[in-house]
Amino acid sequence: MAKKKKKQKRQVTKAIVHIHTTFNNTIVNVTDTQGNTIAWASGGTVGFKGTRKSTPYAAQLAAQKAMKEAKEHGVQEVEIWVKGPGAGRESAVRAVFASGVKVTAIRDVTPIPHNGCRPPARRRV
């Protein structure tokens, strides 16, 4: 059987950190400026299950894991794009700041409908 070639790590200096927060989970995706994924993590990949994935602490750990992996690819400067209404927004952004990379911008790219689809009915408990 032929030897497998080891995949070479791409060296990227500028990146975009996409933080997607929902009511159930937080996904942190680090991409280059073209949108190709360099590293990613979520509440589930850092070891949480169920409702604990939606906590700010899970979002913090996910951001730390993704940034650690991104730094191995040579990322030094990032732009943060935050999307969604979840609980992990603030803590994920703080974790990116604490990782030691230079943050150039923070953008909120949460999609807002201009009277699009009908939203789900409110819960009656």
Curated annotation (Swiss-Prot):
Function, as annotated: Located on the platform of the 30S subunit, it bridges several disparate RNA helices of the 16S rRNA. Forms part of the Shine-Dalgarno cleft in the 70S ribosome.
Record GO cellular component, one term: cytosolic small ribosomal subunit
Protein name (record): Small ribosomal subunit protein uS11
Keyword Ribosomal protein: yes
Domain of life: Bacteria
GO molecular function, one term: rRNA binding
Family: Belongs to the universal ribosomal protein uS11 family.
GO biological process terms held by the UniProt record: translation
Entry-linked NCBIfam families: PRK05309.1, uS11_bact
